[in-house]
Amino acid sequence: MKAVILCGGKGTRMSEVTNDIPKPLAMIGGKPILWHIMKIYQYYGVNEFILLLGYKGEKIKEYFLDYEWKHNSLTLDSSTGEVQMLGQPETWKITFLETGVDTLTAGRILQAKDYIGDETFLLTYGDGLANINLFHLISYHQTKGAAATVTGIDKVSQFGTLTVEDGMAKTFSEKTSSDGIINGGFFVLSPKVFDYLPKDGNTMFEDEPLKNLAKDGELAVYRHYGFWTAIDTYKNLLEVNKMWNQGQQVWKVW
């Protein structure tokens, strides 16, 4: 199963960092947010990733192209140029898709269609962390038999709010400020989801696609009661770094 990660946003609410790098490369404990997300997936056996790039996407490519030699001990034979890595390399296979700087999220996901094929896949945002059990999430999706499953979080937030009955979304409203179950990312999606994406891609996945999935009874909601956070502002970034430095890395399931 592949994990698709949305990495293209401009991160305007975190300009202290994102003037120079894309938000998924903002550091937590010396490693990018994106690295932490990928390690969560890796712990549950997901090693194939599709990164949907946009703003400063080349920085994400550079990070991973340089990753092994920067983060591992190595032996260099200067006479032959041969390099031997001494550490344990990551077993990731990463596809970097340039999806456009201003492309909306539905359009970014649509561009991944040819790389996903006819299999169920995982999707999340490049700024969200959770100690979610992906085995349970995937099993729940299979049990419900819906086209899509979203992780639902109990939180007062600026994120999308779901009305849920018997584990299925009845309505989806993006970015309200009321109490409720919010969109926590960490989706499981069947290829049927692509039928809900406009061919021009000119919309947010969190707008008409999710609303229509809910209306058609095709959006299941997996309730996660553990740790979850979205690193939406510089203050959020400082908070999770404080947690990391104090040994409270509750999302560190690996």
Swiss-Prot record:
Keyword Metal-binding: yes
Sections of the chain in a coiled coil: none
Keywords: Magnesium, Metal-binding, Nucleotide-binding, Nucleotidyltransferase, Transferase
Entry binding sites for substrate: 6-13, 23, 103, 108, 126
Gene3D superfamilies referenced in this protein's UniProt entry, alphabetically: Spore Coat Polysaccharide Biosynthesis Protein SpsA, Chain A (3.90.550.10)
Protein's GO biological process: biosynthetic process
Family membership noted in the UniProt record: Belongs to the glucose-1-phosphate cytidylyltransferase family.
Protein name stated in the entry: Probable glucose-1-phosphate cytidylyltransferase
Organism: Bacillus subtilis (strain 168)
Name of the gene this protein is made from: yfnH
